[in-house]
Structures are given as structure tokens and as C-alpha cells.
């Protein structure tokens, strides 16, 4: 006699009542973030698990491979959220639809044979070692797949080396080889014709050597450092509005791109402060600079955690950063088969 089990739900909602939130939120913060455990220098070296949202994401996956959505009172429009109810409803609907295996929208201008990769790093505590870092790749395809690949941990001395990077060509080659393997599994064993790698820090020689080795058979390759804090500003002469969204100025392998700004179709600038452009530096550039800018513009429209017109940073960078925060939770360290779909982390 066979055992019949119910399939997992597409999504599990976890509502937090106002009373629970009031009892558990951080009394030293004006936000509604729930206090899981107060961070101290000692605890940070031992157990990097302080974010309730991240801990719940890990728990939902570990105990049933569940996709979850935490619902706080502000999610339903209670309190001063700064958003109207229609915007809140749209954001909630878009996020829920994606988590329940839907694709809210696609962009036709993204090339079907291009693989977009965002690299990030996060802190991992394992076997009492607090000096470990791990690389993480967010892989995005035109069809809407948004996948996560975790690299191998490596030792890192932040006091002497600053921001993490892949310290050997082997580490760099390994994670990009895994990216290509993922692409081939989803594309009937076909390689991508073009691979674009985005990082929020400069590419090091060790990384470039390893990436080039892993991508030796790929026709077109671009390595782009995306700097969000360059301090550069452009001011149109005699104009009341800031530069138009999409303004792109380049020279050689460097460029400035406004992913936010005045939108002629809406006849307004939707921000409240002077927009800041992204500063781009290509460490390898097989594609025309205009194509690199167009890719980034398109990837700012694919954050399915809300229904916003666009975000300032492309999803290759923003999603990699968010997923890295969750992967650093100590309760995930004993999970070998961690989820690859972004739905589990959002």
C-alpha cells in the first residue's frame, strides 16, 4: 500500500500580528524590523544570525522546501508606510505571483543567448572559523529564470585586504564553470554565445585569469565593474529636471549611466533627491559600450520584489547582494543542497 502525501503549497504566508511585532521589534530602532538577537562583536564572529526575515527564509526551506512570504502590518498598508494602498497591493501581488512560480514580465530586448551573472561575497562561519568568505553568483536569463550558485569558501583577512575577491584563478574558474553548466542544463546542452559578469568591486587579475579560462569557448565576454558611489553628477544646462533616465556618456572602457532620472513618458522625475549615476568600468569588453549600457538599463526593470518602474541598480547586483545576506545565516551552514531558485530567498 503506497503512502500518499500532499504536495507542497506554492507559497506559505507568515503573518506577524501588530502585538507580536510590538513585543519583538528592536526598541532602539524606529523601523518595524524584528529583533532576533542583538549583534555584538563576539556574536558576529561566532553566529551571524540576527535578521528574522533571513532566519525564516532558511527555516522554511530546511523544514519543507517552502517558499515563504512574511506579512507584517505594513505589508497590508497599516501605519505610515509612505505608499498608497494601490502601490502596496501591486507590490504584494507581483512578489506573490513570482514566488508561486510565475514570471511577472519579460523584456524582449535581452538577448536569448546571453547569460548575465552578478557576483557577490558573504561571510561564512564554519567549524569555529570566522575568517571565511564565500562567493555567490546570481544567474539571470532572458526567459525569466533567476538562479543562485554558491562558490567554495576561502580564507579572507579583511583587515589587510579590504573588500573580498576571488583569491586564485582556480576559485574564479570554478564558479563560472558552474554557471555555464547551469546554463547548459537549461538550454539542451548549448553554450551561451555571450556571458556578461557584473561586480560591485573591481576585477582582480586572479579573477580575470580564472574567468577567461572558464569562458574560453564563449564568443563574446564582458566583465563590468558597477560603482554605485562615484560622486559624479551631470546637470543639464537650463533644465529644471535632472538628466533623462538612460543618459549614457562613455570614453574607452569607462562610462557613466543614469538608471534613474527624468522620464519623458511620465513627464516627471520620480525621485526626491538629485539622482546619482552608475560609474561603469569594463575590465574586458568584447561588446560595444552601448550594448553594455542597454543591458544594465534592462536589468533595472526586473526586480520582482515590487512593481516599481525601475530600480537604480541592476538585478545582477541587487539580487546577489540580498541572497548573500541570507546565505550568511548560520542555520544554513549545515545545508548541503541549498535552493538555487531566487524564489526561496526573496
Q: Where are these predicted regions, by residue range?
A:
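Long, contiguous domain-sized segments
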Residues: 1-346
Amino acid at each position: 500500500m503506497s503512502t500518499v502525501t500532499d504536495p507542497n503549497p506554492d507559497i506559505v504566508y507568515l503573518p506577524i500580528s501588530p502585538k507580536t511585532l510590538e513585543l519583538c521589534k528592536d526598541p532602539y530602532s524606529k523601523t518595524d524590523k524584528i529583533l532576533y538577537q542583538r549583534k555584538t562583536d563576539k556574536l558576529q564572529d561566532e553566529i551571524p544570525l540576527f535578521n528574522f526575515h533571513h532566519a525564516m527564509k532558511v527555516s522554511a526551506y530546511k523544514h519543507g522546501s517552502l517558499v515563504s512570504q512574511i506579512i507584517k502590518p505594513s505589508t497590508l498598508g497599516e501605519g505610515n508606510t509612505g505608499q498608497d494602498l494601490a502601490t502596496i497591493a501591486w507590490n504584494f501581488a507581483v512578489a506573490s505571483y513570482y514566488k508561486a512560480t510565475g514570471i511577472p514580465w519579460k523584456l524582449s530586448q535581452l538577448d536569448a543567448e546571453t547569460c548575465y551573472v552578478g557576483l557577490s561575497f558573504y561571510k561564512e562561519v564554519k567549524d569555529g572559523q570566522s575568517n571565511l568568505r564565500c562567493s555567490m553568483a546570481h544567474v539571470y536569463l532572458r526567459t525569466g529564470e533567476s538562479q543562485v550558485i554558491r562558490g567554495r569558501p576561502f580564507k579572507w583577512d579583511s583587515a589587510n585586504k579590504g573588500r573580498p575577491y576571488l583569491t586564485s584563478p582556480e576559485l574564479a574558474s570554478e564558479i563560472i564553470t558552474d554557471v555555464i553548466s547551469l546554463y547548459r542544463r537549461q538550454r539542451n546542452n548549448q553554450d551561451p554565445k555571450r556571458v556578461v559578469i557584473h561586480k560591485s568591486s573591481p576585477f582582480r587579475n586572479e579573477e580575470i585569469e580564472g574567468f577567461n579560462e572558464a569562458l574560453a569557448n564563449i564568443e563574446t565576454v564582458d566583465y563590468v565593474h558597477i560603482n554605485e558611489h562615484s560622486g559624479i553628477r551631470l546637470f543639464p544646462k537650463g533644465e529644471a529636471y535632472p538628466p533623462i533616465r538612460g543618459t549614457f556618456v562613455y570614453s574607452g572602457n569607462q562610462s557613466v549611466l543614469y538608471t534613474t532620472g527624468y522620464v519623458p513618458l511620465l513627464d516627471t522625475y520620480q525621485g526626491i533627491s538629485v539622482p546619482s549615476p552608475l560609474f561603469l568600468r569594463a575590465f574586458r569588453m568584447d561588446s560595444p559600450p552601448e550594448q553594455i549600457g542597454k543591458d544594465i538599463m534592462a536589468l533595472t526593470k526586473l526586480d520582482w520584489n515590487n512593481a516599481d518602474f525601475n530600480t537604480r541598480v541592476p538585478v545582477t547586483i541587487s539580487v546577489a547582494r540580498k541572497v548573500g545576506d541570507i546565505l550568511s545565516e548560520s542555520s544554513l551552514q549545515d545545508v548541503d543542497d541549498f535552493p538555487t531558485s531566487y524564489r526561496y530567498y526573496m
